[in-house]
Amino acid sequence: MGDEHSHHKIHSDFLKRTIENLGFNVIEVEHDQRVNIKNNLNIRILAADNCDPELCLKYFGCGIAEKTFGSTTIDTLSAIDNGEQVIINTNDCPISIAETSALKLKNHYKKINFLLFGYSSATAYPQCFHLNSDELQNSQQEIVKNFLSQGELYINLFNPNFFMPFAGRYVLGGKKFILEKHRAEIELEDALEYYLN
């Protein structure tokens, strides 16, 4: 086997098997448990929804699978630390879902040195939906506005020394290239300028 990969323990072992098939040794991390990876390098991973049935939409509570095997969510926040410096990654975690988990992370660490957060959408909406030009433009603007606002909320919550918007660039190519111009996107430089002002 090759390098190690850590991920939040989830009920389905599909993710674990897939990563192992790529040649990695997998370390499954229990929700909100700090795990030593090597020397003084540690990781803590939390399910974005903190296993809240109102957020994960399991209104009747967790089933036997979640209680026995852990979370079934795949969206996670993580903290990587060496005992002195802390990096927080919130990518793919809408703050409306992840606020409780984010607050838990904040309470675990006195100071956040570096914050990573997404600045753009990678979903099928709006480019894969039949919208008129006004609906498309309004949707694009609303999505960009929401992502910028979400990043701002994370910056204000964690108050890091440094931050980096990331994970917002991709290209629709091949047969779907025609949809590229309909994506809700903002250039990284424009997002950074927004956060610096």
In which residue ranges do the predicted regions lie?
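Short, charged, low-hydrophobicity "junction" segments
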Residues: H11-V29, E84-L103, S133-E142
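Active-site HxH/HxHxD metal-binding segment of metal-dependent hydrolases
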Residues: M1-V35, A47-C56
